[in-house]
A protein has these predicted regions:
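Catalytic core of DAGKc-family lipid kinases
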Residues: 7, 34, 39, 76-195
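Gly/Ser/Thr-rich active-site loops/lids in small-molecule metabolic enzymes
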Residues: 152-160, 200-231
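Short beta->alpha linker loops
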Residues: 40-44, 63-66, 92, 139, ...
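Catalytic phosphate-donor-binding core of small-molecule kinases
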Residues: 34, 165-177, 215-241
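Short amphipathic alpha-helical segments
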Residues: 18-20, 72-75, 99-101, 206-207, ...
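A short acidic, amphipathic alpha-helical/loop segment
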Residues: 48, 70-74, 118
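Short, glycine/serine-rich, charged loops/turns that create anion-binding
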Residues: 11-12, 93, 197-200, 226-228
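ATP/NTP phosphate-donor binding region
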Residues: 1-62, 69
Length: 241
């Protein structure tokens, strides 16, 4: 059997992996010679993926989007020919990237896909020599996912992000900038901007509104001008809902 490395984060989401590892491992070991590694803290998944990539044909990770991001970031520092295939069993708070891949909603079904599914190419972004999986953003609310306590995420799920974001409404500030693109430029004060390859950001679908292809070599850009009054702010949230 080919070798597979299974990385998992027990603290992701609402701790949904606790007590669920046995059937996941059953699905993986049916097709692979499996090595198991529980993540030990921030940065561990990236380091292990990078350091042990040459030992495995496929790396499967289970956790939130952050866990997957770490694995991909670790692998992207390697030459293309040295990167193993990546599988993902979503077990986080919002699981944005799982929505892009139309992965099954249950752990067991997602494990079956990670074990036996055929690989497909996915575009990975690069920003200041760092890789990003599906979004690079600036401005309002971009630190919500990092500053929302894990305990709150485990208790409230996606609602924890909404509540944490609500505390930032009074501190939204514009970022004056000029953005150049093919054929033109736009100058304004933007309170939020993102370069993305996703149909869902922070659990909000429809951002961006147009269809997104994950392997077309193109990323989407969204810029939000600073709202001038509560009505405009309400319109922004309505567009995201």
């Amino acid at each position: 059997m080919d070798k597979l490395l299974f990385l998992y984060n027990l603290h992701a989401g609402k701790g949904m992996l606790r007590g669920k590892l046995a059937p996941i491992l059953d699905a993986l070991t049916e097709h692979w010679d499996v090595t198991v590694h529980p993540t030990r803290g921030p940065g561990d998944a990236a380091a292990v993926a990078h350091d042990r990539a040459g030992e495995f044909k496929r790396i499967v990770c289970s956790g939130g989007d952050g866990t997957l991001h770490e694995v991909v970031s670790g692998l992207m520092t390697l030459p293309e020919g040295e990167r193993p295939e990546v599988g993902y069993i979503p077990a986080g708070t919002t699981n944005d990237f799982a929505k892009n891949l139309s992965l099954p909603g249950t752990l067991n079904e997602a494990a079956a896909v990670a074990a036996a599914g055929a690989p497909r190419p996915v575009d990975i972004g690069s920003f200041n020599d760092q890789s990003f999986l599906y979004v690079a953003a600036f401005g309002a609310f971009t630190d919500v996912a990092y500053n929302t306590p894990q305990q709150a995420k485990n208790l409230l799920g996606h609602l924890a992000y909404v509540m944490e974001g609500a505390t930032r409404l009074g501190s939204i500030q514009p970022h004056p900038m000029t953005v150049e693109y093919d054929g033109g430029a736009v100058s304004d004060g933007f309170c939020y901007g993102m370069v993305s390859n996703t149909i869902s950001v922070g659990g909000f679908k429809g951002t961006p509104a147009q269809p997104v292809a994950l392997d077309d070599g193109l990323f989407e850009v969204a810029l939000v001008r600073q709202p001038q009054n509560p009505l405009q702010l309400q319109g922004i949230f309505k567009a995201l809902a």
